[in-house]
Every structure is written in structure tokens, then in C-alpha cells.
């Protein structure tokens, strides 16, 4: 075994010749993770987890710390880039049937949940107006849990309201969870390379494989360069594009913002939550909007793996994509007609996609046998 065996392992990794650009997002996610850990460390050095000083410490980072503004913007916009990549990565897995590699899919969805928790805790840390109220609304959902709800909420807050202990523990969780993400990512990659990645045709590629390096590594590097370039263009010219104007004001528990909403990457789940007028029902729908992804490997009934040759399933998939975008857009709007109706219709369509998977598979199998 050579002394640089890990590099050799990745270099000689056998990969299907026909994987497309959609398979590049794994390496892009790894880059995002490295960037987030690095910038997060430099921010944590200057951040103060105290409700009286947190907002001021962010101002201090952006104004007084050398290149602090860049670190802060890279970390905030890097999170958005992370979610763009992970949503495309999941969509590719859905489209090309990668979920049939069950262990890899399960570890990937666990990764998504951990990432969402990390991002939520991070959004609270600047202690701006929207940070505070988003944290209040989302953590309040725990009160919907029968019998234990109030105790759970008090335990999470560290008191009877969101206060100093809440911010301290959220900072601790935001610091520790990325290490869980790194561990899960390693497990995800190990499980993936145990069976090998899928390909656009959904066939067994064992007879036609090439080394990962140099063929696919250069292909990955192209999209990676475009992503980093986009990131730096946004950081330099449009740093506040994903920010909420309310978050430029310090948290004030006495003043409620006109429209409370989380970061854009949670809006689809928040839109589903808001579309149900019952608190427990909304909380369950919110949890199920992510958890339902775990069921997909078990509901696949089609003879073909990818959607490449499945027109019915393709139609449903692109309906899901447009539904996802519409829920996200509707969740940015106030809770009033017609946005309530739009949210309810799109939420129903979102869950319909996952429920219809086995029936579509059976229907397509039947049509193929008829032909």
C-alpha cells in the first residue's frame, strides 16, 4: 500500500463513463462544508453568545475585524449555496433513481436533517429581529406535542422564554453539529463507494468504468470553479441578496415583525406548516415534508430505475419541482388570500407526488407489458 493511499484510492476509484454534470454536486457540497467550517471558526473567535452583545459582536466582526465582512458574508451566502447544491443533489437522486442504493440514501437524508438543524441554530445567532422571532415561532411548535410539549419547550429554551441560555445552547449546537455533518458525510461517501454510484441510464456500469482521476476530477473542477466564482461575485456585489431587512435591527421581544419567516431554504417546509390551520397538524406536516423522503426506496415499484425512459414519472417530478418553488414563493407572502389557497394546493401536490410513486410504477409496468 503506498504512503499516499487515500489519494490513490480516490484517483483509482472506478466510476461509470456516462455520469453527467448532475453528479458533480457531491464534490461541490464537500467544498461548501469545508468553507463553512473554516469561515465559521474565524467568526466564532470574535462572536459573543450573549443577548446583549451578540448583535454588537456581528457589527464588530463586519466593521473592525480585518476581512471580517468577507468571512461573515461568505458564511451566510455559503449556507445558501450549500442548500442550493443539496436540493439539486437530492433532485438528481430522485430523477435517476439513486435512492435504490438504500443505505446511501438514508445517510443522505439524515445529513439533510442535520444540516437543516445546524442552519436553523446559526440563523438565531446574530440576534436580529427576524432571528429572534423565527426562533420563537419554530421552537414554539414543540408545544404542540401532546403532554410533553410545554416541558420540552421550557427545556429547549432553558427558561420560560427565549433568553440568554437559549442563545448559549444554540451557539454550542451550531458549533458541534458541523462535526456530526463531517462524520455523516464520510459515512455517506463510504456507503456510496461500496456499491458505486448510479448513472443516467440506470444500468449496471461495471463493464464500462474509468478512474475518477483525471477524467471526472477535471469535470468536477469546472462546476466547482463556477460555484466559487458565483459565490465571490455575490459576496462582493450583492452581499445582502438573501438577508431579511428586519434582521438589520436588534432583537426586540416587544415588537413583532409584520411577517415572520425563516431563511429562504426553509420556506418550502414553513409554507407547508402555515397551510394547515391546526398547530399539531402543521407541525406534523412540517416534519413529514422531510421524513417522507425516507420512504422513497420502499415505494419504488417500477421495473426501470431512472426517469430517463418514464414519461409519466417525469411529469410528476417536474410538477414536484414547480410545486417546491411555488410553496417557497407563497411562504414569503402574508397569511391572506390568495396565498393561503396557493399554499394549501401546493402542499397537497407536494405530498401527492410521494404517495403516487408506487401507483405510477405499477401503471408504467402495465403499459410496458401491453406494448
Curated annotation (Swiss-Prot):
Cofactor: record remark: Binds 2 heme b groups non-covalently.
One MF term in the entry's GO annotations: ubiquinol-cytochrome-c reductase activity
Positions of heme b b566 binding: 89, 188
A GO biological process held by the record: mitochondrial electron transport, ubiquinol to cytochrome c
Listed InterPro entries: Cyt_b/b6_C (IPR005798), Cyt_b/b6_C_sf (IPR036150), Cyt_b/b6_N (IPR005797), Cytb/b6-like_sf (IPR027387), Cytochrome_b (IPR030689), Cytochrome_b_C_euk/bac (IPR048260), Cytochrome_b_N_euk/bac (IPR048259), Di-haem_cyt_TM (IPR016174)
Obligatory cofactor(s): heme b
Keywords of this entry: Electron transport, Heme, Iron, Membrane, Metal-binding, Mitochondrion, Mitochondrion inner membrane, Respiratory chain, Transmembrane, Transmembrane helix, Transport, Ubiquinone
Compartments reported by the entry: Mitochondrion inner membrane
GO cellular component: mitochondrial inner membrane; respiratory chain complex III
Transmembrane segments: 25-45, 69-90, 105-125, 170-190, 218-238, 280-300, 312-332, 339-358
Binding, heme b b562: 75, 174
Membrane topology of this protein: Multi-pass membrane protein
Note: Heme 1 (or BL or b562) is low-potential and absorbs at about 562 nm, and heme 2 (or BH or b566) is high-potential and absorbs at about 566 nm.
Complex and partners: The cytochrome bc1 complex contains 3 respiratory subunits (MT-CYB, CYC1 and UQCRFS1), 2 core proteins (UQCRC1 and UQCRC2) and probably 6 low-molecular weight proteins.
Cited function: Component of the ubiquinol-cytochrome c reductase complex (complex III or cytochrome b-c1 complex) that is part of the mitochondrial respiratory chain. The b-c1 complex mediates electron transfer from ubiquinol to cytochrome c. Contributes to the generation of a proton gradient across the mitochondrial membrane that is then used for ATP synthesis.
Homology family: Belongs to the cytochrome b family.
Name the record gives this protein: Cytochrome b
Originating species: Malayopython reticulatus
Amino acid at each position: 500500500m503506498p504512503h499516499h493511499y487515500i489519494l490513490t484510492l480516490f484517483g483509482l476509484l472506478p466510476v461509470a463513463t456516462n455520469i453527467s454534470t448532475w453528479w458533480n454536486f457531491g464534490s461541490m457540497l464537500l467544498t461548501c462544508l469545508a468553507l463553512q467550517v473554516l469561515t465559521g471558526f474565524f467568526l466564532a473567535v470574535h462572536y459573543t453568545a450573549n443577548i446583549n452583545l451578540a448583535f454588537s459582536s456581528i457589527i464588530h466582526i463586519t466593521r473592525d475585524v480585518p476581512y471580517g465582512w468577507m468571512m461573515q458574508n461568505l458564511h451566510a451566502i455559503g449556507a445558501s449555496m450549500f442548500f442550493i447544491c443539496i436540493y439539486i443533489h437530492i433532485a438528481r437522486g430522485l430523477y435517476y433513481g439513486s435512492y435504490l442504493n438504500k443505505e446511501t440514501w438514508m445517510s443522505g437524508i439524515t445529513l439533510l436533517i442535520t444540516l437543516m438543524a445546524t442552519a436553523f441554530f446559526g440563523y438565531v445567532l446574530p440576534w436580529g429581529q427576524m432571528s429572534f422571532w423565527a426562533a420563537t415561532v419554530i421552537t414554539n411548535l414543540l408545544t404542540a406535542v401532546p403532554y410533553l410539549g410545554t416541558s420540552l419547550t421550557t427545556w429547549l429554551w432553558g427558561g420560560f422564554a427565549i433568553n440568554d441560555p437559549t442563545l448559549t445552547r444554540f451557539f454550542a449546537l451550531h458549533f458541534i453539529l458541523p462535526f456530526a455533518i463531517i462524520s455523516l458525510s464520510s459515512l455517506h461517501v463510504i456507503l456510496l463507494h461500496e456499491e458505486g454510484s448510479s448513472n443516467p441510464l440506470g444500468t449496471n456500469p461495471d463493464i464500462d468504468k474509468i478512474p475518477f482521476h483525471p477524467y471526472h476530477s477535471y469535470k468536477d473542477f469546472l462546476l466547482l470553479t463556477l460555484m466559487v466564482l458565483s459565490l465571490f461575485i455575490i459576496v462582493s456585489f450583492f452581499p445582502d441578496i438573501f438577508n431579511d431587512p428586519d434582521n438589520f435591527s436588534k432583537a426586540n421581544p416587544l415588537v413583532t415583525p409584520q411577517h415572520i419567516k425563516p431563511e429562504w431554504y426553509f420556506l418550502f417546509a414553513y409554507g407547508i406548516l402555515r397551510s394547515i390551520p391546526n398547530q399539531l397538524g402543521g407541525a406534523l406536516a412540517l416534519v413529514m415534508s422531510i421524513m417522507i423522503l425516507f420512504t422513497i426506496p420502499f415505494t419504488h415499484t417500477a421495473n426501470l430505475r431512472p426517469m430517463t425512459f418514464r414519461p409519466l414519472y417525469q411529469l410528476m417530478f417536474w410538477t414536484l419541482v414547480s410545486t417546491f418553488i411555488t410553496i417557497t414563493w407563497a411562504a414569503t407572502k402574508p397569511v391572506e388570500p390568495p396565498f393561503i389557497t396557493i399554499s394549501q394546493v401546493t402542499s397537497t401536490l407536494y405530498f401527492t407526488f410521494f404517495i403516487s410513486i408506487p401507483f405510477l410504477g405499477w401503471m408504467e409496468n402495465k403499459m410496458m407489458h401491453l406494448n
